[in-house]
Amino acid sequence: MNELANPLELCGFEFIEFVSEDGQLDAVFETIGFSKVAKHKSKNAYLWRQGKINIILNYQPESYAAYFYKEHGPSACAMGFRTKNAAKAFKKAIEIGAEPIYNQIGPMELNIPAIKGIGGSPIFLVDCDIYQNDFIFFDDVASNPVGTGLYEIDHLTHNVYKGRMQYWADFYEKIFNFQEIRYFDIKGEYTGLTSKALTAPDGKIRIPLNEDSDKGNGQIAEFLNEFNGEGIQHIAFICDD
């Protein structure tokens, strides 16, 4: 497999999903320019948008997101990768060694395939407009709001336990053929860390992996302790100014 191969035919981030107590994160996303544009047809979940960025806020009880919240608190609990053929990509990922996740779906809902990612969070594989099928758009809100000028996801990071950075680098390379584009070794007496920046074959999905340096008592360890495990630490957006 060469560095240009795109075995799962990825073509960018489709969405990032967050979980919290009901309504807890609404003000956060509204403050930075997102608009609530649609509600899920059968679940307590909402689609927020700005530019090309899709954020799903999931408040549904007894869902995978609810269980994720009990373990980690308010957080990014899933992400969606856009692909040309989700069923084909899912089959290929399982053949390569990915672990499938099967979620409970309601009547007339799309069955969106998913595999287990960082911290047990789902990575959904999406090949169509899931929102028109599963969400009801609000009539009085623009479906593609401009907001404050954020228009695309640049990257998101994973904070991992010391010694696990290579494990996750291997995971992304094996399943998706991500490639390393940068390696940082940031020295500091108390806050040193190493970071391996990965990018998907499409060049649109970028995920830096971070772990603490030798002492292991820095900012990465602080996140892992507070979050109660490995996970998505931050998301960076591209803006127009």
Predicted regions and their residues:
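Short, structured coil/loop segments at alpha-helix boundaries
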Residues: 62-65, 214-218
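Catalytic lobes of large eukaryotic enzymes
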Residues: 220-222
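A generic structured-segment signal
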Residues: 66-70, 224-225, 239
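Surface-exposed interaction/gating patches
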Residues: 12-19, 140-206, 212-217, 226-241
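An N-terminus-focused feature that recognizes amino-terminal "leader" regions
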Residues: 1-140, 155
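Short loop/beta submotifs within extracellular cysteine-rich repeat domains
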Residues: 36, 55-56, 206-207, 216-217
